[in-house]
Amino acid sequence: EPKLPSAFAVVNPNRLDVESGEGRLAAVGVAFLLAIAINRVLRDKGWYGERSEPNLMQWLDLVALGTVCDVVPLSGLNRALVTQGLKVMAGRGNPGIAALADVGGVDETPGAYHLGFIMGPRVNAGGRVGTPDLGSRLLATNDHAEAKDIAIRLDALNRERRDIEQAVLDQALDQMTDDPDAAGAVAFVSGQGWHPGVVGIVASRLK
């Protein structure tokens, strides 16, 4: 195994010396399990003797959102985290996620589809074509008015992202149509001014 960095702990289920079998966890799942482990150590050491212990389960809605949007296999622990996270999400305790559901027209109990195709793209839209910190601000705020405002902005950015993506995709497909050699086992397309925030999505749609 390559030399590990100098650190108190290198938390990665894909390390060669880890036998957990959880190498397909999304990063958000790894972070959540780390938080649980740290919380357990603090509890055992009496840290919460005169302090309130945090309810980590309330964050499972964020874990579910991140897991689905990372497109990891929804099996094993990933599936369990998403299943429980969707239950938390249905309670609308996170103002940002509730606002996302509202602007996305999700008026039913959310499922993995809603996370992957309705809510996730809106969270990511700020980073693709707008202000990168909008998504994190939305998910971190406890202010319902602020959450609504940010969600509306992200919804608008997501529409803009779709328009830009479609324009780039159309140009890429035109190139493949005009050049028979471009549509072989490996396709090469390029364009002046293509937005870097959508080229990855377009590439995946050319497969």
Where are these regions (language model features)?
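Hydrophobic helix-and-loop "lid/oligomerization" segment in the mid-to-C-terminal part
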Residues: 40-207
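Flexible loop/turn segments at secondary-structure boundaries
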Residues: 2, 18, 195-198
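Short alpha-helices
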Residues: 5-48, 56-68
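Histidine/acidic-residue-rich catalytic or RNA/ligand-binding cores of hydrolases
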Residues: 4-5, 132
